[in-house]
């Protein structure tokens, strides 16, 4: 555990309650800088304490937005979501920049079309035989709301020649 005395971070002093709080959060899971900043503001830490603590954690590589984006992208893809939905969540809810999201996607290089097919198979096992317009609309709404582009899934719906 970190001592009760103040720690040095660059030229500024940082209180150990702020550092203890952030380390406790990071011990449980990854957080984006934006999420940690919001949580620390809710706890009433000063902007200087927040800046110093986050800079210290980033210097020690305890907090890294790129690593967070890669882990989040992998996790959400495994839960059945497409890139558009994941990107929106990372930007709006987690405060990650478009550049970092693109870097994470390039690093991981997932095959979104194959992923869309996997999601289709799981959610709609008879996807290749769908001819009913209402059911096709349901499939389209589901896939679009989960962040898939039409070109990633449309040609599979109602076409048996793509069945493996």
From Swiss-Prot:
State the UniProt keywords alphabetically.
Cytoplasm
Localization terms from the record: Cytoplasm
Give the highest taxon in the source lineage.
Bacteria
**GO terms classed as biological process:** regulation of DNA repair
Q: Does the keyword Acetylation apply?
A: no
Q: Name one GO cellular component term.
A: cytoplasm
Q: Name one Pfam family in it.
A: RecX_HTH3
The reply to whether Cytoplasm figures as a keyword in the UniProt entry is yes
Family in the record: Belongs to the RecX family.
General function of this protein: Modulates RecA activity.
Kindly provide the name given to this protein in its UniProt entry: Regulatory protein RecX
Q: Which gene encodes it?
A: recX
């Amino acid at each position: 555990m970190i001592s009760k005395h103040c720690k040095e971070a660059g030229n500024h002093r940082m209180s150990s309650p702020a550092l203890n709080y952030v380390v406790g959060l990071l011990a449980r899971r990854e957080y984006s800088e934006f999420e940690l900043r919001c949580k620390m503001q809710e706890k009433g830490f000063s902007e200087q304490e927040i800046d110093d603590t986050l800079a210290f954690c980033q210097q020690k590589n305890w907090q890294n937005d790129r690593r967070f984006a890669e882990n989040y992208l992998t996790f959400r893809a495994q839960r059945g979501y497409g890139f558009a939905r994941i990107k929106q969540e990372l930007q709006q809810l987690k405060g990650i920049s478009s550049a970092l999201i693109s870097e994470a996607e390039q690093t991981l290089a997932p095959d979104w079309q194959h992923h869309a097919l996997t999601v289709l198979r799981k959610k709609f096992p008879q996807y290749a035989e769908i001819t009913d317009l209402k059911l096709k609309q349901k499939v389209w709404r589901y896939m679009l709301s989960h962040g898939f582009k039409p070109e990633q899934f449309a040609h599979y719906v109602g076409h048996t020649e793509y069945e493996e």
